[in-house]
């Protein structure tokens, strides 16, 4: 085989702990990695590594199906989803399955179907994983050259990258098709308090879509997390799907340019580090999205956002005290600022009190009361609808603050309900996962770069305690 790489640059492409580079085997002697190093033993065994990945996919899909059915079995239609600790059914409801006006669940059968489909898929994946891990060929290069690869083969690696991008693009278009043609998706902004609707007028203007990417991440700007209508979200998926598919075709048809060949380290561990870095960014972005965004993650299913619960509390007490005769336009609070209403730094009328820091919240139950200059005093006096009062009282008592033992809600709110919001769970878990994936990115990037430079020898294992212990088998 012709040499695909410069020996000087890529000698020891993989960092082996004991310096041997024998191909076969899954033991420490032949691979340089002990059993607990997992897939590192399979760096050069493409067939076995395929088995590990397919089995891993099976475990993921099995969890999704089993947890889905568990949530269906425990679901009480009379209670909101966010009070029941559900993290999967809200995603299905957001996609428009099983829900009607106001986010009310009218049919749980689609949720059951989703769980069963995932379980069946996981069985297929599990079988494939076991087959390739135990029975299939150790390496794919000889029998199935299309599926085989050498980590150093840059052209093959970018072809694999291209295939992945095309699959991601297809995934983005599946959401577009669901929103446009297959029943629509749940829109929390639909008049009267949310409903499932088909998206008709997609936002495809590049200045609007890519404008989100160029926005500041701070305050009311909020980067891509500030998206607040479904036309923009689905239109963004059209753009994203197109870019992924076109980029995938590009990477399949082309070879890496000279600058790319020089800039990147071309080894299995380097690709692992790139992937972990990307997933870390996904995790941090998802964390911010689920915490702040009530359009992609409707409050009817996930509970209110923190700012939303806070503004709901101010609104609820404004409604109460106005009924008791308070003049909410002029009442003064203990600090000399308005007790119920005040002005923002830019002059809009906003809720007063501690919730002033959340003045740029937008929520479907509040927007009808705004005028051209912030909250409209006339509407607040004459136009508040019962559904707005009910919803804000509900959100006030379900703030997404809570510890693991379910002591939830605002500490000073005597009506707060003991629960932990799915927003808390999803934001926290994605932040923690994003953080650890970032650490993994740094670790594997460091090892891959050192290996490429030729000075990473790994840990000296000659005197490691485990070597003097009885083998497990």
Curated annotation (Swiss-Prot):
GN (gene name): psbC
- MF-aspect GO terms: chlorophyll binding; electron transporter, transferring electrons within the cyclic electron transport pathway of photosynthesis activity; metal ion binding
Residue ranges of the propeptide: 1-14
Species of origin: Cuscuta exaltata
Subunit structure, per the record? PSII is composed of 1 copy each of membrane proteins PsbA, PsbB, PsbC, PsbD, PsbE, PsbF, PsbH, PsbI, PsbJ, PsbK, PsbL, PsbM, PsbT, PsbX, PsbY, PsbZ, Psb30/Ycf12, at least 3 peripheral proteins of the oxygen-evolving complex and a large number of cofactors. It forms dimeric complexes.
Predominant cellular place of this UniProt entry's protein: plastid
InterPro entries according to UniProt: PS_antenna-like, PS_II_antenna-like_sf, PSII_PsbC, PSII_PsbC_sf
Q: What's the family?
A: Belongs to the PsbB/PsbC family. PsbC subfamily.
Residues where N-acetylthreonine is found: 15
Any idea which residues bear Phosphothreonine here? 15
Q: What is this protein called?
A: Photosystem II CP43 reaction center protein
């Amino acid at each position: 085989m012709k040499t695909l790489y410069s020996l000087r640059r890529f000698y020891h492409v993989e960092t082996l702990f004991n310096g041997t580079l024998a191909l076969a085997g899954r033991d420490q002697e032949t691979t340089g990695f002990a059993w607990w190093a997992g897939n590192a033993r399979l760096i050069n065994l493409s067939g076995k590594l395929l088995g590990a990945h397919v089995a891993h996919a099976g475990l993921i899909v099995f969890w999704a199906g089993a947890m889905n059915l568990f949530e269906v079995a425990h679901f009480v239609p009379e209670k909101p989803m966010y009070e029941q600790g559900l993290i999967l059914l809200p995603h299905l409801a957001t996609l428009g399955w099983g829900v009607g006006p106001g986010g009310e669940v009218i049919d749980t059968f689609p949720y059951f179907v989703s769980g069963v489909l995932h379980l069946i898929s996981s069985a297929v994946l599990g079988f494939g994983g076991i087959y390739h891990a135990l029975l299939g060929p150790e390496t794919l290069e000889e029998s199935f050259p299309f599926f085989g690869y050498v980590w150093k083969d840059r052209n093959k690696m970018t072809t694999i990258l291209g295939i992945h991008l095309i699959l991601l693009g297809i995934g983005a278009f599946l959401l577009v098709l669901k929103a446009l043609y297959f029943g629509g998706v749940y829109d929390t902004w639909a008049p009267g308090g949310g409903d499932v609707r088909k998206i008709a007028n997609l936002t495809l203007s590049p200045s609007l879509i890519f404008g989100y990417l160029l926005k500041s991440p701070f305050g009311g700007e909020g980067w891509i997390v500030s998206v607040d209508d479904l036309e923009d979200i689905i239109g963004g998926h059209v753009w994203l799907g197109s870019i992924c598919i076109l980029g995938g075709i590009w990477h399949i048809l082309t070879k890496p340019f000279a600058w790319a060949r020089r800039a990147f380290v071309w080894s299995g561990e380097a690709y692992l580090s790139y992937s972990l870095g990307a997933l870390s960014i996904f995790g941090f972005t998802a964390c911010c999205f689920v915490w702040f965004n009530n359009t992609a993650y409707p409050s009817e299913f996930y509970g209110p956002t923190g700012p939303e619960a806070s503004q709901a509390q101010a609104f609820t007490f404004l409604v109460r005290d106005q009924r008791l005769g308070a003049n909410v336009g002029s009442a003064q609070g203990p600090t000399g600022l308005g007790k119920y209403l005040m002005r923002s730094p830019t002059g809009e009328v906003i809720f007063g009190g501690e919730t002033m820091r959340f003045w740029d919240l937008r929520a479907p139950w509040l927007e009808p009361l705004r005028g051209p200059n912030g909250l409209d005093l006339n509407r607040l006096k004459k136009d508040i609808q019962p559904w707005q009062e009910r919803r804000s009282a509900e959100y006030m008592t379900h703030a997404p603050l809570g510890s693991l033992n379910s002591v939830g809600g605002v500490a000073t709110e005597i009506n707060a309900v003991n629960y932990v919001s799915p927003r808390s769970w999803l934001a926290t878990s994605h932040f923690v996962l994003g953080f650890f994936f970032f650490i993994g990115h740094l670790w594997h990037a460091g090892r891959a770069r050192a290996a490429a430079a030729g000075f990473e020898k790994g840990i000296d294992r000659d005197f490691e305690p485990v070597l003097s212990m009885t083998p497990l088998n």
